[in-house]
Amino acid sequence: MASNEQEALSMIECAKKNHVVLLEAMRPDFDPAFDMIKNALPRIGKIRRASFEFCQYSSRYDRFKDGIIENAFNPALGNAAVSDIGVYCIHSLVRLFGTPKNIHSMSSSLENNFECSGIVLMEYPDMIAEAIYSKVTVSYRPSVIQGENGSILIDYISHPTQIELRLREGSRDPINGGIKEILPYSPVNNNMIYEIKNFLSLVENNGIEHEYLQYSLDTIRIIDHVLASHTSVH
């Protein structure tokens, strides 16, 4: 929504002053898959670990390697990898588990000091979460939430198309008696339609102050912390 917390606060203040709706277009927030994941959490027992991953090789990276620096890799534009795609992982973790009590991070940078990939460890009272992101590599691993009785696997954190529940041996699910289940979710071609529907609903109902603003602020504070304190590796 903004490149730092102060910008975000200014935008929120301006929106309220002018009685207009401000909403970050965070795709996972409004996808029905998110509620399905949230509702499945009790089935895997006490949550101990979550690992959300979004590593996508940028189509512009090859041009960067040829010496052509486009906006996607220009550090002056405030679009570091953590802000561009790491935000999907961090925001989803904040939505599900709240703000962490401690944050640790490490990032890699390109020759022009552009932050291109990294990992953010988020410490909670009873669990640890990690956000893994990159604009210069690709990953095929799912994002995972691990509980004492099983795990939830999400194929793409930014736009889920399959959500799988796996329970450990000896912890058969009381709902269907099994230990593996593909949750009944039917993805659409473009899940941006859900954020548009929610935005229209907020506008129609004069929803100037809404819960999503706080999620955006909590997320950008974490990103600010990462960019201010990360250890850069070239």
Identify the meaning behind each predicted range.
Residues 143, 160-175:
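Short polybasic amphipathic segments
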Residues 198-234:
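C-terminal helix-rich "cap/oligomerization" subdomain common to oxidoreductases
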Residues 183-197:
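Active-site loop of classical SDR/Rossmann-like NAD(P)-dependent oxidoreductases
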Residues 8, 34, 89-90, 162, ...:
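A general structural signal for well-ordered alpha-helical segments in protein cores
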Residues 28-101, 233:
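Predominantly a Rossmann-like dinucleotide-binding segment in NAD(P)-dependent oxidoreductases
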Residues 12-21, 35-49, 147, 151:
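Basic phosphate/pyrophosphate-binding loop/patch that engages nucleotide-derived ligands
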Residues 1-26:
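Beta-strand-loop-alpha-helix segment that lines the small-molecule cofactor/substrate pocket
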Residues 89-161, 196-207:
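Contiguous beta-strand/loop segments that form the cofactor/metal-binding neighborhood of enzyme cores
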